[in-house]
């Protein structure tokens, strides 16, 4: 009876030692990628491990991760411990089904920066068992970006609209302005102005005013004209036709309106 228990004890020890040393059997790091998970508001760093024969396996490993955006800002640095429970089968259209580790990073742990794209650098290792060189993958249009600030003129602001002869054809009063910063994919800024036509007729077809957008250093970023169609005296309007695409996250802008010059 003692021999029976001794044999089974040795079997259990061997099985446990085999599970615990799985990191030492790892020979290959492969199939890494990075994505944002909209449903859970976090990020996933995927990678696969394989033995010397290319057979996928799981292992308890540590992962040093740092994320640097395209503005050369380090927005994340940390170490995650990965267990065999973090491995599973994942399917993609490009690679089919793969056995991968899913290392999750909460969105709140990644700082907002000046670019939504960048690189994810990571090193997979386990002390006294396995050590891989640092590798990287792309983070495309998924990193958090900073808000922008826009300063407007003091309102109300009366702007004269001149005709070809230089005479005042109408007066447009700007009563307010606001902005919307869209962070999805390519950042863009939408400016909405509200106001009233104080004088003039609708015979000209449209009233035209000009705008300019400056950055915090005083450089002109964008300029153009706003066309207000078929307004009669006393008509109120709301215009959101100004959409600017060349926007830097985290920047402070000044938006100025002026009379159009022929």
Predicted regions and their residues:
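Positively charged n-region of N-terminal signal peptides that target proteins for export
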Residues: 1-4
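C-terminal motif of bacterial Sec signal peptides marking the signal peptidase cleavage site
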Residues: 15-18
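Transition segment at domain starts
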Residues: 21-42, 139-188
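Contiguous beta-strand segments within globular domains
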Residues: 36-50, 58-60, 100-102, 185-192
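A short beta-turn/strand-edge loop motif at beta-sheet boundaries
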Residues: 53-60, 111-113, 198-206
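Short beta-strand/loop motifs in extracellular/secreted proteins, especially
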Residues: 61-63, 170, 205-209, 251-253
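Conserved aromatic beta-strand anchor motif in extracellular beta-sandwich/beta-rich domains
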Residues: 65-69, 211-215
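Short, solvent-exposed, Trp/other aromatic-anchored flexible loops in extracytoplasmic proteins
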Residues: 74-144, 216-262
């Amino acid at each position: 009876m003692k021999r029976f228990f001794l044999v089974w004890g040795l079997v259990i020890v061997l099985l446990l030692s085999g599970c615990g040393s799985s990191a030492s059997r790892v020979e290959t790091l492969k199939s890494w990628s990075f994505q944002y998970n909209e449903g859970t508001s976090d990020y996933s760093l995927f990678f696969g491990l394989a033995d010397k024969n290319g057979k996928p396996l799981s292992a308890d490993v540590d992962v040093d991760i740092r994320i640097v955006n395209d503005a050369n800002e380090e927005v994340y640095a940390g170490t995650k411990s990965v267990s065999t429970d973090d491995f599973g089968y994942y399917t993609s259209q490009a690679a089919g089904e793969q056995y991968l580790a899913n290392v999750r990073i909460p969105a709140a742990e990644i700082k907002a920066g000046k670019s939504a794209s960048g690189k994810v650098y990571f090193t997979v290792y386990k002390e006294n068992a396995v050590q891989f060189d640092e590798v990287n993958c792309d983070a495309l249009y998924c990193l958090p970006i900073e808000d922008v600030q826009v300063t407007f003129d003091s309102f109300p602001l009366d702007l004269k609209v001149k005709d070809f002869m230089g005479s005042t054809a109408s007066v447009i009063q700007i009563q307010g302005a606001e902005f919307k910063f869209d962070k999805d994919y390519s950042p863009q800024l939408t400016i909405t102005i509200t106001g009233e036509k104080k004088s003039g007729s609708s015979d000209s077809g449209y009233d035209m005013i000009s705008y300019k957008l400056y950055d915090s250093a005083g450089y002109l970023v964008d300029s153009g004209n706003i066309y207000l169609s078929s307004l009669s005296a006393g008509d109120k309007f709301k215009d959101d036709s100004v959409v600017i695409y060349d926007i830097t996250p985290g920047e402070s802008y000044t938006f100025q309106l002026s009379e159009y010059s022929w």
